[in-house]
């Protein structure tokens, strides 16, 4: 959860000791109940908003985690402008973005974690989220609706960060991307091949001309 200046609430004095104000680790499964609610709402809608993530919305994904946090620590709702992925926040920090409306977010996490898709015009509509829990609507409204591929730039590194990291001030920062997806690209994945990313989890990535609706 971040304020309108893209600052995580956990970096404020008021919430620095509140775990719900911090980034939530991907493998946290405390939002199983919320994920089940989202899956039920998706089935009832008949729209298939989770079709590009295997037809099932996981507790490891964005909306389930956000809803669980807002229910567990409702006081954060008044302070939060929206919620963002870590892979989107870091490029914003490095490029000096301090306005949520000017932040460039990546297509990768939006599609895999937040049910964004061109075919329904971006994110699912407000009515879908309101039917699950109205707490999600302000988060949706304040979220940047334009997304960018990882081949695009987020901006130029700030002088402060360039000097701190010992980099040229001409360095361009790329759009954020999910690590396992980036690993597949780095491994040289091509049509008809599979890349296995092994770490704290195992992600098997493949490219096919077919559209099985599985990530």
Residue ranges and their predicted role:
Residues 13-16, 20-25:
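Short, acidic/small-residue loops that bind anionic groups at enzyme active sites
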